[in-house]
């Protein structure tokens, strides 16, 4: 009995250590994705909303455009062309590019699970969770994640590597955003027509958001 107890104790310790290492590895990898997306954001748009990487970032100090749906913008040269940048555009880039990065490294399933976990985290902890705008933003994020995963899978199976692969990935991300394959703003009408959160493989995510509603007259659907 004493020998069995020692075996159980060692097994429990081994499992505990393994779980701790796995959690640490996932957290470290997630941070690496956030860091690299932030670097790309700063380099391309002159601003990073994930991790501020510059002492002076571009500010949304210019009038709204049709694509920004009433939100302020700023002007920046993006890929050689002047562009009015708005917050939702940055968020869309984060999800498409971040999902593409993850899918190219850990596969589509890993990227899918990682970014779905992010949606649950935001639904639980973000202040505006439970609002209609947050709900549509979640649908937009999930749709953009799917677009990014396809891009990443293509890069993973392609012949390019290193800087060339990264540049091709960014090119594909902008093709998706500019071509309408991805969604630039959660206020677009077509976002409201996207599948339900359950259809995206996120059970109970809608329930969490509904629990966070401060205005019970708002229907999230």
Stretches with model-predicted labels:
Residues 3-221:
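Intrinsically disordered, low-complexity, mixed-charge
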């Amino acid at each position: 009995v004493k020998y069995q107890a020692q075996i159980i104790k060692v097994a429990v310790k081994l499992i505990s250590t393994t779980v701790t290492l796995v959690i640490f590895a996932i957290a470290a990898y997630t941070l690496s994705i956030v860091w690299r997306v932030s670097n790309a954001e700063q380099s391309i748009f002159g601003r990073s909303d994930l991790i501020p990487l510059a002492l002076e970032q571009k500010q949304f100090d210019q009038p709204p455009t049709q694509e920004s749906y009433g939100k302020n913008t700023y002007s920046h040269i993006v890929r050689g062309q002047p562009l009015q940048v708005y917050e939702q555009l940055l968020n869309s880039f984060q999800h498409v590019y971040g999902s593409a990065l993850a899918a190219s490294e850990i596969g589509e399933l890993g990227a899918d699970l990682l970014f779905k976990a992010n949606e649950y985290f935001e639904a639980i902890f973000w202040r505006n969770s439970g609002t209609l705008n947050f709900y549509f933003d979640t649908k937009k994020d999930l749709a953009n994640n799917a677009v990014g995963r396809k891009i990443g899978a293509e890069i993973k199976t392609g012949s390019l590597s290193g800087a060339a692969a990264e540049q091709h990935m960014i090119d594909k991300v902008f093709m998706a955003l500019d071509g309408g394959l991805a969604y630039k703003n959660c206020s677009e009408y077509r976002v409201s027509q996207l599948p339900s959160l359950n259809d995206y493989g996120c059970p109970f995510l809608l329930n969490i958001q509904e629990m966070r509603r401060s205005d019970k007259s708002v229907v999230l659907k």
